[in-house]
Amino acid sequence: ASFTFRYEIAPNSPDKPPLLNILERVNASSGSVSGQYAPGKLQLSFYQLNEDDSVKTSPFTRVYIDSEETLFDIGQLYTVLRQAVTDKLSLASVLLPEWSLGDYISQTQAAAVLGVETNKVELQELSGFTLSLKGLKKVSPSAARDGYRYYQFPAAADGTTLVLGFSTDALFSKTTPIHVLLTIPEHNVHIQLTGTVTSAKTVLSPPASRMSDEDIATLAQIRQSVESVWKMIQSAAQTTN
């Protein structure tokens, strides 16, 4: 299946998870996500929104998920972050080199760079949900939309809950309007998505461009450089105000 959604991510408490902090840094706690689903696998592309609420043409990152691992396109995310920083401070291009490492990092590598436990960045539980009505429980969530029929999947091992709302007007169409309510306790977030799912035979494979473990120290240094330049920009903005 393929899909396109508008999404909104909200923390369930004041303690924001690491991945949400990164999304907020690129103004992407709400945006658009498109992707493909095959049994046990997900490929996602995340897009920021323009000021007029239209979707940007290029994704700010991509994520590949299967039962074994979660892979993040850190190369694309860095490129977007670097552009945002250099737009505000052109001299930052000297401190922040263009990306030259492998594009994707694993959840283990991401956790090492962020200094958090692996379960704070992995998303493998999402690959275990099957797009089938078998075994689903009909529910009536408080955020239900008129004209939608809602079903809840059995909770995942980590407590992740997924509720799908199908438009009753197009329940058996090839392209179906969907309303998704997703709660991930490990990441302390609630995610709401609205869009469409199109049935299609999909074959997904892990991305080929991977970062080696030897380059993680370099990535950690790059992250520190980004943080330092960002703080410099924020300090300058506060002084100006």
Language model features with spans:
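Subset-of-secretome marker
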Residues: A1-N241
